[in-house]
Structure formats: structure tokens, C-alpha cells
Curated annotation (Swiss-Prot):
GO terms for cellular component: extracellular region. Its main location: secreted. Gene3D superfamilies: Peptidase S8 propeptide/proteinase inhibitor I9, Peptidase S8/S53 domain. Glycans are attached at N233, N251, N399. This is Subtilisin-like protease CPC735_035780. Secreted subtilisin-like serine protease with keratinolytic activity that contributes to pathogenicity. GO terms for molecular function: serine-type endopeptidase activity. The keyword Hydrolase applies. It comes from Coccidioides posadasii (strain C735). GO terms for biological process: proteolysis. Belongs to the peptidase S8 family. Pfam families: Inhibitor_I9, Peptidase_S8.
């Protein structure tokens, strides 16, 4: 074989190994300095992944020693979600450059801060959402539902935590994990409110479902993508260990700027056997934002939910677009709050748990799989939403009560 042919084959082999990419978003807002999410290629074995993490840790420590730095940082979270593998942590740019050179790495993404998708809170006021989703026509305050009410389904509230001792949960709620830091409690109230809509005895839809608190956002309602992916990772592993895959739902009433890693992790969790309802997000009414520009609302296979008003219109704050699968009540929703209390909130945060709750109820009553739930809800949904937004469905959530 000629030297020219050998050289050609050599360089062809080199080019066949695609270099890892550092995803650098044009919008730099909410980026956490020196914090990264590293995602492996799909063909990397678990054993090779473990070896890679040991190598990356050694590189990190060597760079610190070379710089004479006393900083710690390094690897923080490890992700294994239905074959999707990655990790996150605080690393110097020199370490990230070495990681990008590794053939097992698919891409590296800067970590970002994340926020809730609720807007306003007003304590102790009446609600309307339950009556609306159980009747074809507006204006009925009675909630009509199948008595199985989510029995046998496990709900994962990926949020600010849940007041697991709230009387409306009747002992069905347990604490799961905390990736946000702080106390193992809901110091904000958002997570308890969304959980109450999903599975509260008085304020909820799937009144017999189990609840698991997955705290990924702080008392101030903020967090990081890396911690949210870890919450998803923990939930999948918990569901697998407790034989709940295929019989589980998750609500994600949170959002932030577009993230490839968050979208992939959320999609893998859905495909692993958890039905996931995601808030479409809220923006200033003058912005008119497309949910395709946010995560995890733009993730594949999940059920993205926009917010409707009491008059069956699109809420002025609600994101819209082709990613939206369905609308659900999202203004002035009363539900549980910490300390055995109740309160009123508005936002796509309040719409998504209606879908998670009906999803749990439909899974229990019809025996369908998580992958079938969203299409089923769209199938039975009501064509009621006025001004839904350009290229957006006009379907409103309905629990198929027959009323």
C-alpha cells in the first residue's frame, strides 16, 4: 500500500471520531460561571463511563495543583437515565478543554439558573379548575371523576419540595431527595401547591396516588439545570427500584433558557416509563413567546401545557407554539400550601399539574402506558380555547367524565 493511501486512511480514521462540542448559547443570561454539564456519547459503556469520570477528576485535581489553587469544585452529580449518561460540576476552563478532547464525550453545556413558572399568589380563595376539566361546557363547579382516582400511580413532584405532612395528602406523601440544598422541606410553597392539584384529597385530581417530593429548587424558587437533571435521574432510579416505571407521572412546573442536556434527560425519563407534564412557561404579555425557546417545554415526547383562563382563553402570560400539546386551567388556582394551608396561584405552573393529575387518573382507569397518555389527553380534549396563539392547539384538558 502506498504512503499516500496510508496517510489518507489515517486521516479518514481521525475525522471519523467527531470532536465533542462546547455548546455556547448566544444568550448568556443565567449561566453559572465555571459550572458545566458533560454528556457522553450513546455508545459509551457504563464501565467506560466510570473510568472516564475517574480520569476527569484526576485532570481537575492536576489543574488545581498546577495553578496552586485551594479551590475544590469538581464532579457533583452523576446521571444515568435510560442509557443517557453524563455528569456535572465546577471545573476550570483548562479542565473543560481536556474533557472536550476526550473521544467518549458528546458535548459539554454551561450550567444555567432555572426559575419557577408561577406568577402570583393570593391566599385562601375559591378555585374553578377541577370543575372545568370535568365538564364539556364552562360554568360548572362540581368535580366529576372516576373513583379509581390515580390509585396505584406514583407522582414525582420535581419542584421546591412538598409539605408531606399536609392533611390533604392523607399520609400518601413521602420525601424523596433534595438537590437544591437547604432544608428537606418546601420553604417556598410552589411545590406543595402543584402537588395538591395533582393528588390532594380536596384540591387534587388523582386523589389516591402516592406523592414523592423531589426538591430541585430553593426556597427562593431558583435552581440550576445540573440539579434538576439529578432530580430527574433520582426519580427514574427510584421508580425502577420500586417497580413504578410504567405507573408513574412527573410534573415539572419550572423552566429556563434552552438546554440540550435538560431536554435529553427529560425525554429519556419519559421513555423510561414516566409520564411527564411540563409547563410551557410564562412571559411578559407583550413578549408573546414560543415555548420552543425554553426547556424542558421543548423536550421531545413530554406533554407541554399552556395556561387557560376561566373564560377558556389563553392566559396573557402563557407561552404558546407548536410545542404546546394542550391547555389547562392556570389562573387563580387554589391548592395546598405549607403548614396545612391553602392559597391561590397563577401560571403555567398551575396548568401543568392538572395534566399530570388527569394523566395519573387516566393511567389508573384505562390502563394505558405513559407513552400513550399525552396523545390520549389530546384525543379527548375539548376544542374550546379562543386565541390560542399562532400555530398552537386549541385543545382544553378534559378528564372524560362524560359530563
Amino acid at each position: 500500500m502506498s504512503i499516500m493511501k496510508i496517510a489518507t486512511l489515517f486521516f479518514a480514521a481521525l475525522s471519523a471520531v467527531e470532536a465533542a462540542k462546547l455548546l455556547t448559547p448566544s444568550d448568556k443570561r443565567d449561566i453559572v460561571p465555571d459550572s458545566y454539564i458533560v454528556v457522553m456519547k450513546d455508545n459509551v459503556s457504563p464501565l467506560k463511563f466510570d473510568s472516564h469520570m475517574s480520569w476527569a477528576t484526576n485532570v481537575h485535581h492536576a489543574n488545581l495543583a498546577r495553578q496552586g489553587s485551594t479551590a475544590t469544585g469538581g464532579l457533583k452529580h452523576v446521571y444515568r437515565i435510560d442509557g443517557w449518561q453524563g455528569y456535572s460540576g465546577s471545573f476550570a476552563r483548562e479542565t473543560i478543554d481536556r474533557i472536550l478532547e476526550n473521544d467518549d464525550v458528546d458535548y459539554v453545556e454551561p450550567d444555567r439558573r432555572v426559575h419557577l413558572t408561577a406568577l402570583t399568589t393570593q391566599p385562601n380563595a375559591p378555585s374553578w379548575g377541577l370543575g372545568r376539566i370535568s365538564h364539556r361546557n364552562n360554568g360548572n363547579s362540581n368535580f366529576v371523576y372516576d373513583d379509581r382516582a390515580g390509585e396505584g400511580i406514583t407522582f414525582y413532584g420535581v419542584d421546591t419540595g412538598i409539605d408531606i405532612n399536609h392533611p390533604d395528602f392523607g399520609g400518601r406523601a413521602v420525601w424523596g431527595t433534595n438537590t437544591a440544598g437547604g432544608s428537606d422541606s418546601d420553604g417556598h410553597g410552589h411545590g406543595t401547591h402543584t402537588a395538591g392539584t395533582v393528588a390532594g384529597a380536596s384540591y387534587g385530581i388523582a386523589k389516591k396516588a402516592k406523592l414523592v417530593a423531589v426538591k430541585v429548587l430553593s426556597e427562593g424558587g431558583t435552581g440550576q439545570w445540573s440539579g434538576i437533571i439529578e432530580g430527574i435521574n433520582w426519580s427514574v432510579n427510584h421508580a425502577r427500584a420500586n417497580n413504578a416505571l410504567g405507573k408513574a407521572v412527573m410534573n415539572m412546573s419550572l423552566g429556563g433558557r434552552l438546554s440540550t442536556s435538560v431536554n435529553q434527560a427529560t425525554t429519556r425519563a419519559q421513555r423510561a416509563g414516566i409520564f411527564i407534564a411540563v409547563a410551557a412557561g410564562n412571559e411578559d404579555p407583550s413578549v408573546q413567546s414560543d415555548a420552543a425557546n425554553t426547556s424542558p417545554a421543548s423536550a421531545e415526547d413530554v406533554c407541554t401545557v399552556a395556561a387557560s383562563t376561566e373564560q377558556d382563553g389563553r392566559a396573557s402570560f402563557s407561552n404558546w407554539g407548536s410545542m404546546v400539546e394542550i391547555y389547562a386551567p392556570g389562573t387563580n388556582i387554589v391548592s395546598t400550601t405549607p403548614g396545612g394551608n391553602t392559597g391561590k396561584m397563577s401560571g403555567t405552573s398551575m396548568a401543568a399539574p392538572h395534566v399530570a393529575g388527569v394523566g395519573a387518573a387516566i393511567m389508573a382507569s384505562e390502563g394505558i402506558s405513559p407513552s400513550e397518555v399525552c396523545s390520549r389527553l389530546v384525543e379527548i380534549g375539548l376544542e374550546q380555547i379562543s386565541n390560542p396563539g399562532s400555530g398552537t392547539t386549541n385543545k382544553l384538558l378534559y378528564n372524560n367524565s362524560g359530563r
